[in-house]
């Protein structure tokens, strides 16, 4: 068996990535989220495949086909809710994974980090298009509002929006192409994940101390395979509690009303995992400015390696930047709350303050905190 594992051209690659991979001996449970994201991706592809067997991407029958899946297909309700809530678990793991990367300075592995940002954009695009497919009220109006943002692009905006819609409004052509893209993107994401891993294995994993761990490595299997398995069981437990007890808690009741272009819902809002970005978008009165802020809210992550001022890699021994980090986390929670609120006083002003704070903490306060900590270190 050892001979096959180490000599076979294909199994050898798997061996170097998941079995004999030298891993730092001290990585904590915060390093579990990579494998959990892989598990989420597998769950989403499998449940999505079975849903696609029964779904019809036609405006006349899309809503009915989803109802048919839940009512008539064997375990269709289970597959549907695993897919919908699986997306939420996916984003919870994503946010924790990115948060871990920021906390422990993993963004200094620039290729891996940038690949991760591309993956984040790809997953967000996939989730957005998936939300349109059930063709409920929030599906239709969410698609209309978000795609319409592209009309803010000077000169080509309006043409671009009509090109994406395949007509003069969100209609049959839009739904069909969104289904096609929603189906193909997870496979593109899988390919990007392999590139992400390729870049990671060039440098090796970071660890909670932020120090070089070459002197103290252990094999990935069995130590981290068993640790990842525990994480996977906890993820599946959380997912199944959500699916079997509270399947609709994260959804919008409006999406149980079939799409009606003549009736606008009182509050158009995306799924919970986009609310922070939606709040940033809404906090700027100008359309183009809002779109730019929306894109920058994610793209700003690419600046993090260049905004790193500290002599230390992670925040483990940096109390001032730690404080800034947790204020940033609280700020993102405030933005998520504001994104789900109506556009009225005092929510507008809170959203604007939280949006300014978000960018200021990342671009100004965290780098300054790093410099102050350097000075304190030099005083020693």
Curated annotation (Swiss-Prot):
Residue numbers binding heme b b566: 97, 196
Membrane topology: Multi-pass membrane protein
GO biological process: mitochondrial electron transport, ubiquinol to cytochrome c
Cofactor needs: heme b
Record-linked PROSITE patterns: CYTB_CTER, CYTB_NTER
Compartments, record wording: Mitochondrion inner membrane
Top-rank taxon, per record: Eukaryota
Positions contributing to a ubiquinone binding: 201
One Gene Ontology term, aspect cellular component: mitochondrial inner membrane
Pfam annotation, one family: Cytochrome_B
Assigned keywords, A-Z: Electron transport, Heme, Iron, Membrane, Metal-binding, Mitochondrion, Mitochondrion inner membrane, Respiratory chain, Transmembrane, Transmembrane helix, Transport, Ubiquinone
Transmembrane segments: 33-53, 77-98, 113-133, 178-198, 226-246, 288-308, 320-340, 347-367
Cofactor, how bound (note): Binds 2 heme b groups non-covalently.
Database matches in CDD domains: cytochrome_b_C, Cytochrome_b_N
Molecular function (Gene Ontology), one example: metal ion binding
SUPFAM superfamilies: a domain/subunit of cytochrome bc1 complex (Ubiquinol-cytochrome c reductase), Transmembrane di-heme cytochromes
Residues involved in heme b b562 binding: 83, 182
Subunit note: The cytochrome bc1 complex contains 11 subunits: 3 respiratory subunits (MT-CYB, CYC1 and UQCRFS1), 2 core proteins (UQCRC1 and UQCRC2) and 6 low-molecular weight proteins (UQCRH/QCR6, UQCRB/QCR7, UQCRQ/QCR8, UQCR10/QCR9, UQCR11/QCR10 and a cleavage product of UQCRFS1). This cytochrome bc1 complex then forms a dimer.
Family, per entry: Belongs to the cytochrome b family.
PANTHER family (UniProt xref): CYTOCHROME B
Additional comment: Heme 1 (or BL or b562) is low-potential and absorbs at about 562 nm, and heme 2 (or BH or b566) is high-potential and absorbs at about 566 nm.
Role according to the record: Component of the ubiquinol-cytochrome c reductase complex (complex III or cytochrome b-c1 complex) that is part of the mitochondrial respiratory chain. The b-c1 complex mediates electron transfer from ubiquinol to cytochrome c. Contributes to the generation of a proton gradient across the mitochondrial membrane that is then used for ATP synthesis.
Name of the protein described by the UniProt record: Cytochrome b
Provenance organism: Lemmus trimucronatus
């Amino acid at each position: 068996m050892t001979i096959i594992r180490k000599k076979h051209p294909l199994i050898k690659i798997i061996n170097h990535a998941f079995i004999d991979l030298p891993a730092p001996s001290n990585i904590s449970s915060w390093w579990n989220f990579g494998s959990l994201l892989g598990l989420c991706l597998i769950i989403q592809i499998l449940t999505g495949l079975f849903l696609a067997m029964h779904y019809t991407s036609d405006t006349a029958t899309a809503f009915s086909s989803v109802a048919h899946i839940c009512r008539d297909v064997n375990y269709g309700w289970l597959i549907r809710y695993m897919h919908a809530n699986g997306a939420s678990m996916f984003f919870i793991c994503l946010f924790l994974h990115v948060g871990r990367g920021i906390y422990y300075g993993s963004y200094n592995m620039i290729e891996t980090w940038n690949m991760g940002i591309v993956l984040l954009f790809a997953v967000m695009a996939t989730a957005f298009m998936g939300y349109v497919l059930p063709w409920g009220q929030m599906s239709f109006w969410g698609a209309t509002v978000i795609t319409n943002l592209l009309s803010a692009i000077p000169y080509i905006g309006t043409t671009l929006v009509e090109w994406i819609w395949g007509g003069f409004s969100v209609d049959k052509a839009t739904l069909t192409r969104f289904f096609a893209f929603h189906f193909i993107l997870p496979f593109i994401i899988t390919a990007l994940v392999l590139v992400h891993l390729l870049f990671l294995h060039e440098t090796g994993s970071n660890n909670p101390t932020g120090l070089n761990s070459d002197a103290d490595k252990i094999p990935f299997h069995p130590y981290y395979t068993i640790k990842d398995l525990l994480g996977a069981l906890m993820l599946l437990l959380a997912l199944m509690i959500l699916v079997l007890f509270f399947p609709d808690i994260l959804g919008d009741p409006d999406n149980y009303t079939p799409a009606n272009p003549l009736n606008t819902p009182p509050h158009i809002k995306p799924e919970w995992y986009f609310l922070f970005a939606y709040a940033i978008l809404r906090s700027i009165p100008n359309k183009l400015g809002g779109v730019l802020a929306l894109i920058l809210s994610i793209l700003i992550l690419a600046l993090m390696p260049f905004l790193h001022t500290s002599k230390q890699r992670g925040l483990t021994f940096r109390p001032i930047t730690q404080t800034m980090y947790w204020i940033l986390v609280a700020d993102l929670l405030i933005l998520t709350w504001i994104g789900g609120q109506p556009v009225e006083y005092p929510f507008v002003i809170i959203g604007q303050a939280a949006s300014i704070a978000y960018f200021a903490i990342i671009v100004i306060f965290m780098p300054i905190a790093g410099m102050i900590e350097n000075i304190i270190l030099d005083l020693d």
